A protein has these predicted regions:
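Intrinsically disordered, low-complexity regions enriched in Pro/Ser/Thr/Gly and acidic residues
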Residues: 74-185
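Surface-exposed loop/turn and secondary-structure junction residues enriched for glycine/proline
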Residues: 4, 10, 34, 64-65, ...
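Alpha-helix exit/C-cap motif
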Residues: 50-69
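N-terminal single-pass transmembrane signal-anchor helix
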Residues: 1-41, 48
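Surface-exposed beta-strand edges and their flanking turn/coil or helix-capping segments
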Residues: 45, 54-57, 163-164
């Protein structure tokens, strides 16, 4: 007598249904890993910017340059322009030289890119940086001038970025913040 081994049609259908249910349950978790990774990276970048700008402010205080506009402070051989102790939002040949990471400098948002291109520029590198940008080009709730860092595959209008921004009124800094916007990550 010959014995046949294999799956019946019902067993095969049950296996396919179970795999389908598992895929539906597991897929959202795997799909959100990229989002979680982008958010974690941006939070680390913002924390680094916060520590860096606080350190530069401390250096300006030590050198008695925190009460003057448009003064230079040297940190680790890098000259940083400050406004009342807050570092200017210049990445290239300035803050970028003091940050570790795989950043790609896109350009100056005010002179090189302009309002429309700043918001719509799509990052093709791991992390892109646009500096010297009126923060209102990107987000109306951020005051002053900003530096924006965003991940590959995103533009600033996608609302997935880290930023450093500050505002001054001619006699003091009125706002200085390093943070993230991650609603669109």
């Amino acid at each position: 007598m010959i014995s046949h081994r294999g799956f019946t049609l019902i067993e095969l259908i049950l296996v396919i249904v179970v795999l389908g249910v598992l895929a539906v349950v597991a897929a959202p978790k795997f799909l959100s890993l990229n989002r979680d990774a982008n958010i974690a990276t941006l939070k680390q970048v913002a924390a680094g910017l916060d520590q860096l700008t606080d350190g530069i402010y401390a250096k300006a205080v030590i050198q008695h340059k925190h009460k003057v506009s448009n003064e230079s402070v040297t940190v680790n051989g890098v000259t940083i322009n400050t406004y009342f102790g807050a570092p200017q939002e210049i990445w290239n040949n300035a803050l970028g030289d003091l940050m570790d990471g795989d950043f790609s400098y896109v350009g100056n948002g005010y002179f090189d890119l302009g309002a429309s291109l700043v918001a719509s520029y799509n990052c093709q590198e791991r992390l892109c940086v646009i500096d010297q940008t009126p923060a209102s080009y990107v987000n109306s709730s951020i005051q002053g001038w900003g530096l924006f860092i965003f991940p590959k595959g995103y533009s600033l209008q996608d609302e997935c970025y880290a930023y450093y921004a500050f505002a001054e009124n001619g006699s003091q800094v009125t706002s200085k913040v390093a943070s993230t916007v991650d609603t669109g990550c």
